[in-house]
């Protein structure tokens, strides 16, 4: 609060030698009583700087003019003293050269509202700056003042323009305080390098708007606005700056007594007339800055101690005012500046108080000075002090009863013609992405396109107009000049292509833009065309469509003018000169009397009343045409009128019909065009549906994108975090486990780094680094104490080191795991980005989808057609899907029928499959049918069936790769066991050798046919996808050829079979006769048995040589039976082997290795047709037959004789059972089929012949681990092994064994599993000795699972003597004395022959 009695001293360049007013000890001011009666001259009372101090000499008239010091303060009435008149000299007060003082506009009323986005300190600074920049009487800062302040930030003009657009919310061109604070805050953001927002945040905008509204509510209404246009407008208060208004100069003639003042009456040349007392102090004057001078110092008035006045500068550069000798000064505590005065040079005037002059609307207030706190202020004219270094300017005045104009809340209006360049209003909210676009399209800039799209945000901007704004035009012109290096005034197509492709738009969009811009088809663009192209690119980047033709706003002015000129020329050329509008010809010269021509019809003004009757009568006579409105019409006239009207009506009807026809025809034509368009659209939609649209719809993509976001942003990070936690926990647990192991081994060990003993002081009891350091210091102290006292600390450095290494190892492993997890997370992130890029859609696609897929934003008719098209498309897709499904179903069925027909042609009427070939064909047909059904259910169509359409006989080459069902395996093996007993004599070996070359060509021919068939089938496979009919014909042709070969082969086999059967029957009859003859005598029996051995060997040899083709039949049995029950894996492995010719070659050349490696696996048997005889094994076979053996077989050394060196003994047992089939057999647990077949061999010769045909199967099964021998003598072995198909088609197991075999699995690979009750057979040479003792061996039961044994010394000696003891030999057989211990390392009878 201001204290008027407190001295206010300012050391701003005052001159201490100057005193004004009273001296230090005087009560009166010095007066100069000269020039008492001189007239007053003009006195310069402005603030002239640096005037000399005039107190050092007398007042001179020529030393300038100035105001005499006046007494201030309250005192007694004093006599009037003469006042110096004339040129009052100015008084310098030492203000020259001082710095300007910044003053605040304290009249501003700014509400105390806090802006949240600005700190309190910054808001206070901004308010101070705003108050100093806003002049008095204003509430906002102008654009010029604001630009001067904002330019001090050092930012570019473009950035400041964006800041201004953001800050000037109401677009008034000036800023209120909240807007000004916002602009300064944005400047500080830009200075810090932060990006400016394109649109103000909602919170900031709401706060600024509410602040502005609060300021607008607090501004009082102007009284002059209220009094305007009313009768009381003259009573409106004058403005303080109205210096042209008449001034009251205090002249009062009839004043009875002067008022009580502290001033002495002054003589001013009018003796006896006193000046009105002036109060010149008591108010703190506002600081002003005229030039380099400082503000005036406040003066103290009133009674009390007399204080000298402060030095005041009263000179300046402001012109004086004509206001009389002394202008009334403002008194009281009102903050107003001293007014410049001009005194002198006027007619003699009375000073003092008088009434105001007429016509002045203000009265001078009477003042009481000295000691009174309430002083009335007086408005006087003058200049408002300026706060700058410019010349003072006049303040705008209201001159007359004009209504005050509002100067706030103006909206920026576009000026000029619509679309005219350079006159387009700037859009609000800034131009989005324009700065980024300017930087992106510069020549040397290689920024990625994604930055530009992210700046544009690819969203529709409402403030992106068609017209080009000034700022945009400047940016586009700058880009044009940057690319036009040679200053040609245009850019060619190559440069424009480089510029436009930087936008990242599609080729079709850029082509459309080029077509719109290059109107002259010159292949180059000038500056205006380049600007239009860039603006179209800019709009396209903001999500707008490219127009089909340029709008008027984008046509350059030069092009528009040229186009208008060309149009006018075309019109003139079309219509000729007569088409131009004719103007009245101008007179060549002024009309004169010589050229005057009188017009008699041109009367002057004639009154209508005077000639009314005459004119009406003339008109009635002239108008002879009757109308329907006449009242005196005759019948003829009425008929005539009716006829005329009828003609007119007919003409109107005809015209209406013509118009209707034309309209209907045009409408029909338009409808036809619309229908054609609809049909074309339907056809295109049909093509699209047929081609198929694999991409998901917009809604599906949005759903997938939402699911992707959920998985990648919620689920995956949580899983990664959990995995990290588990990984760290595993690392800790590993360290703990290792520590526990060490503690278990060393109970006295006390680990040093055991954190379990550390008491954590961190949050939630966690162990911090400080806790570890503290614990380590304690441990060190403990160790030192232990070293001093000699006690053990329980520590062990080695164990500690091991624990530390284990912990570090666990941590390293955990870190590696973490890196792997990070790599996985990075891979997931990459996949997420790829998926998001594929699933995300642009704004244009969404708008197009809503418009043309959902029917939004288009007319009702088009929307209706869109819905119809959608329904039509759905129906099309449904039909196409149904037809495709039917084709997929029909194709496998057709192939199944084809295959079935191929198979049924060869054996359709042979369902009973009396022969093995027929059975194989039937089984194969059934297998193919079931296979096709399964594949059809899985939706798989088999393109080529050539490998499966081969005749059943051709499958022998791949029989090793086919699984065999148990039932078929058992039946085939049973037959093999039944026939194997009838071993032929050794003398039949030449027969088999002779027959072997005859059979090999057949087998080779079959192999060749298979190879050729594979070639043909592969060729058909290649072309099957193109033409099914050709494939079908080729398959039929192959089928016919194979059937012909099959018939020929069957005829040959049947003929050979009949011959072999006849021979076998003869041999059987001879053998039967021998048995009957030798059964009477024991010696004769022995001789008979020896003979029968030879006979059976010969028979077996003959059977093997004759039954070679029948072995193929058994192979077909195995293959065809195995297919229906094989697994999918077996099927997949089956086809490559069957169609691969190299598998046959490998099988032909590697029989030995295959047999030895595969063991008991029947699926890997070779197809060799010539097998070399191993002489060592043959010799071992002969030795075994003769009874020469190294030991009884029960020694521990397994290396003395191997399983492969000893012959197969299973055939000997079967031979013995066949030879003695007529005798009573001991009860066994084997199936009855074996015994019955053995007992009825002699009676059922035809069945035995069939069983003989399958003999190689059993032989191969029994001897599949041997590369050379197969259970016969050496001669038989050679003849047998050289038979081509013997080792190929052997079934794996005999049929006589039930599926669950006996428990002991101790049979070797050489012998097939036999029933538990039948003892293992001895070697073949010991067979004769077993015949008479067979009944003796019935009572003793056999040992539980006796392994096969080698022949012992006893049997060999008996064989050598010639008359062996048969009973003793049979006892040895039943007792298992001659059996040797074997290692059961392959499989037992339960697994042989099963499907793996």
Curated annotation (Swiss-Prot):
PANTHER family: DYNAMIN ASSOCIATED PROTEIN 160, ISOFORM D (PTHR11216:SF170), EH DOMAIN (PTHR11216). It comes from Candida albicans (strain SC5314 / ATCC MYA-2876) (Yeast). Residues 1365-1382 form the WH2 domain. The keyword Transport does not apply. Residues 1037-1093 form a coiled coil. Residues 1-20, 249-269, 318-383, 569-630, 746-771, 877-916, 933-1369, 1377-1396 are annotated as: Disordered. This is Actin cytoskeleton-regulatory complex protein PAN1. Component of the PAN1 actin cytoskeleton-regulatory complex required for the internalization of endosomes during actin-coupled endocytosis. The complex links the site of endocytosis to the cell membrane-associated actin cytoskeleton. Mediates uptake of external molecules and vacuolar degradation of plasma membrane proteins. Plays a role in the proper organization of the cell membrane-associated actin cytoskeleton and promotes its destabilization. Gene3D superfamilies: EF-hand (1.10.238.10). The gene is PAN1. The keyword Repeat applies. It comes from the Eukaryota. One of its GO terms (biological process) is endosomal transport. It is found in: Cell membrane; Endosome membrane; Cytoplasm, Cytoskeleton, Actin patch. Pfam families: DUF1720, EH. SMART domains: EFh (SM00054), EH (SM00027). Residues 1284-1327, 1337-1350 have a biased composition (Pro residues). One of its GO terms (cellular component) is endosome membrane. It is a peripheral membrane protein. Component of the PAN1 actin cytoskeleton-regulatory complex. Residues 122-211, 472-561 form the EH domain.
């Amino acid at each position: 609060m201001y204290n008027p009695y407190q001295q206010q001293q300012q050391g701003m360049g005052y001159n201490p030698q100057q005193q004004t007013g009273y001296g230090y000890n005087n009560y009166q001011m010095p007066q100069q009583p000269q020039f008492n009666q001189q007239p007053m001259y003009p006195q310069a009372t402005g603030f002239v700087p640096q005037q000399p101090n005039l107190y050092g000499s007398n007042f001179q008239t020529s030393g300038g003019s100035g105001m005499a010091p006046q007494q201030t303060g309250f005192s007694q009435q004093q006599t009037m003293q003469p006042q110096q008149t004339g040129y009052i000299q100015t008084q310098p007060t030492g203000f020259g050269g001082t710095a300007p003082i910044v003053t605040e506009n304290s009249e501003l009323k700014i509400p105390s509202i806090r802006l949240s986005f600005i700190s309190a300190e910054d808001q206070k600074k901004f308010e101070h700056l705003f108050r100093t920049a806003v002049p008095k009487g204003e509430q906002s800062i102008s654009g010029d003042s604001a630009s001067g302040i904002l330019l001090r930030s050092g930012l570019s003009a473009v950035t400041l323009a964006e800041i201004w657009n953001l800050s000037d919310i109401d677009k008034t061109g000036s800023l209120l305080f909240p807007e000004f604070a916002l602009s300064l805050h944005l400047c500080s953001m830009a200075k810090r390098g932060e990006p400016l927002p394109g649109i103000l945040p909602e919170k900031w905008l709401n706060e600024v708007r509410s602040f502005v509204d609060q300021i607008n509510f607090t501004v009082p209404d102007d009284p002059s606005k209220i009094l305007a246009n009313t009768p009381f407008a003259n009573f409106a208060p004058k403005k303080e700056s109205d210096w042209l208004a008449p001034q009251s100069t205090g002249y009062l003639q009839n004043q009875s007594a002067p008022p009580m003042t502290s001033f002495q009456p002054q003589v001013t040349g009018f003796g006896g007339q006193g000046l009105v007392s002036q109060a010149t102090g008591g108010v703190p004057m506002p600081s002003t800055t005229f030039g380099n001078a400082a503000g005036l110092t406040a003066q103290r008035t009133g009674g009390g101690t007399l204080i000298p006045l402060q030095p005041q500068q009263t000179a300046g550069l402001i012109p004086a005012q004509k206001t009389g000798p002394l202008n009334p000064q403002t008194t009281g505590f009102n903050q107003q500046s001293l007014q410049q005065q001009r005194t002198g040079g006027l007619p003699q005037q009375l000073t003092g108080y008088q009434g105001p002059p007429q016509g002045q609307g203000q009265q001078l207030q009477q003042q009481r000075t000295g000691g009174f706190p309430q002083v009335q202020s007086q408005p006087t004219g003058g200049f408002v002090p300026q706060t700058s270094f410019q010349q003072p300017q006049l303040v705008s005045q209201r001159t007359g009863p004009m209504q005050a104009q509002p100067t706030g809340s103006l909206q920026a209006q576009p000026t000029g013609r619509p679309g005219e360049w350079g006159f387009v209003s700037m859009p609000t909210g800034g131009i989005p992405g324009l700065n980024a676009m300017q930087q992106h399209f510069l020549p040397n800039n290689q920024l990625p396109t994604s930055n530009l799209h992210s700046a544009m945000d690819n969203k529709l901007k409402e403030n992106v107009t068609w017209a080009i704004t000034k700022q945009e035009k400047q940016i586009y012109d700058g880009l044009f000049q940057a690319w036009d290096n040679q200053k040609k005034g245009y850019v060619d197509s190559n440069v424009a292509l480089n510029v436009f492709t930087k936008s990242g738009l599609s080729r079709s969009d850029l082509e459309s833009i080029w077509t719109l811009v290059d109107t002259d088809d010159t292949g180059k663009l000038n500056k205006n065309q380049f600007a239009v192209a860039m603006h179209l690119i800019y709009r396209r980047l903001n999500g707008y469509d490219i127009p089909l033709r340029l709008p008027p706003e984008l046509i350059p002015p030069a092009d528009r003018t040229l186009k208008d000129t060309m149009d006018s020329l075309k019109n003139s050329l079309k219509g000729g000169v007569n088409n131009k509008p004719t103007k009245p010809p101008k007179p060549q010269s002024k009309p004169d009397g010589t050229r005057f021509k009188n017009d008699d019809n041109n009367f002057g003004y004639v009154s209508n009343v005077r000639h009314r009757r005459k004119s009406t009568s003339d008109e009635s006579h002239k108008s002879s045409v009757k109308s329907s409105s006449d009242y005196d019409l005759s019948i003829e006239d009425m008929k005539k009128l009716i006829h005329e009207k009828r003609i007119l009506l007919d003409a109107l009807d005809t015209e209406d019909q013509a118009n209707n026809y034309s309209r209907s025809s045009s409408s029909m034509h338009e409808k036809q065009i619309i229908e054609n368009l609809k049909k074309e659209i339907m056809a295109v939609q049909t093509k699209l549906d047929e081609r198929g649209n694999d991409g998901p719809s917009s809604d599906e993509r949005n759903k997938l994108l939402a699911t992707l976001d959920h998985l990648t942003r919620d689920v995956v990070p949580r899983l990664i975090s959990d995995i990290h936690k588990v990984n760290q926990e595993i690392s800790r647990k590993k360290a703990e486990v290792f520590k526990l192991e060490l503690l278990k081994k060393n109970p006295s060990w006390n680990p040093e780094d055991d954190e379990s003993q550390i008491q954590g002081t961190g949050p939630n009891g966690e162990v911090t680094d400080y806790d570890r350091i503290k614990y380590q210091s304690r441990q060190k102290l403990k160790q030192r104490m232990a070293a001093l006292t000699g006690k053990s600390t329980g520590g062990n450095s080695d164990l500690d080191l091991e624990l530390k290494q284990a912990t570090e190892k666990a941590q390293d492993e955990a870190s590696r795991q973490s890196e792997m997890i990070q790599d996985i997370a990075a891979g997931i992130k990459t996949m997420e980005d790829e998926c998001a890029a594929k699933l995300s859609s642009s704004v244009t696609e969404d708008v197009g989808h809503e418009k043309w897929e959902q029917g939004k934003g288009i007319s009702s008719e088009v929307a209706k057609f869109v819905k119809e098209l959608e329904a039509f498309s759905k129906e099309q897709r449904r039909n196409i899907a149904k037809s495709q499904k039917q084709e997929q179903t029909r194709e496998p069925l057709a192939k199944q029928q084809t295959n079935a027909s191929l198979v049924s042609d060869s054996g359709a009427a042979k369902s009973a499959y009396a022969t093995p070939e027929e059975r194989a064909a039937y089984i194969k047909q059934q297998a193919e049918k079931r296979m096709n059904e399964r594949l059809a259910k899985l939706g798989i169509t088999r393109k080529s069936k050539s490998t499966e359409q081969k005749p059943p006989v051709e499958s022998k080459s791949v029989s090793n790769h086919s699984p065999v069902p148990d039932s078929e395996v058992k039946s085939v093996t049973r037959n093999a066991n039944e026939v194997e007993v009838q071993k032929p004599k050794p003398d039949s070996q030449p027969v088999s050798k002779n027959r072997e070359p005859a059979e090999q060509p057949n087998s080779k021919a079959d192999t060749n046919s298979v190879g050729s068939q594979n070639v043909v089938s592969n060729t058909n496979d290649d072309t099957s996808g193109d033409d099914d009919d050709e494939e079908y014909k080729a398959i039929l042709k192959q089928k016919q050829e194979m059937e012909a070969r099959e018939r020929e082969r069957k005829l040959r086999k049947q003929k050979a079979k009949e011959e072999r059967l006849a021979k076998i029957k003869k041999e059987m009859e001879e053998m039967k006769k021998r048995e009957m003859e030798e059964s009477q005598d024991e010696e004769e029996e022995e001789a008979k048995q020896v003979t029968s051995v030879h006979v059976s060997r010969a028979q077996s040899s003959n059977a093997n040589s004759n039954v070679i083709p029948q072995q193929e039949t058994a192979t077909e049995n195995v293959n065809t039976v195995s297919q229906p029950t094989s697994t999918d894996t077996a099927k997949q492995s089956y086809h490559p082997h069957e169609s691969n010719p190299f598998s046959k070659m490998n099988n032909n050349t590697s029989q030995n290795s295959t047999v030895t490696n595969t063991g008991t696996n029947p699926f890997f048997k070779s197809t060799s047709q010539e097998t070399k005889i191993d002489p060592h094994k043959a010799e071992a076979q002969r030795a075994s037959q003769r009874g020469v053996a190294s030991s009884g077989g029960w020694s521990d050394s397994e290396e003395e004789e191997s399983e492969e060196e000893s012959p197969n003994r299973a055939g000997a047992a079967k031979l013995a059972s066949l030879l003695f089939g007529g005798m009573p057999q001991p009860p066994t647990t084997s199936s009855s089929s074996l015994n019955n077949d053995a007992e009825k061999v002699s009676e059922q010769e035809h069945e035995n012949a069939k069983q003989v045909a399958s003999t190689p199967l059993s032989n191969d099964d029994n001897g599949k681990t041997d590369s050379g021998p197969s259970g016969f003598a050496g001669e038989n072995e050679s003849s047998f092994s050289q038979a081509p198909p013997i080792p190929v088609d052997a079934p794996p197991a005999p049929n006589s064994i039930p599926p669950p075999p006996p428990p002991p699995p101790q049979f070797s690979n050489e012998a097939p599993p036999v029933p538990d009750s039948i003892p293992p057979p001895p070697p073949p040479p010991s067979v004769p000795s077993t015949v008479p003792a067979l009944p003796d061996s019935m009572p003793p039961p056999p040992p539980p699972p006796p392994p096969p044994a080698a022949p012992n010394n006893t049997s060999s000696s008996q064989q050598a003597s010639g008359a062996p003891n048969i009973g003793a030999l049979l006892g040895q057989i039943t007792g298992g004395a001659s059996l040797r211990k074997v290692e059961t390392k392959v499989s037992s009878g339960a697994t042989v022959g099963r499907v793996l």
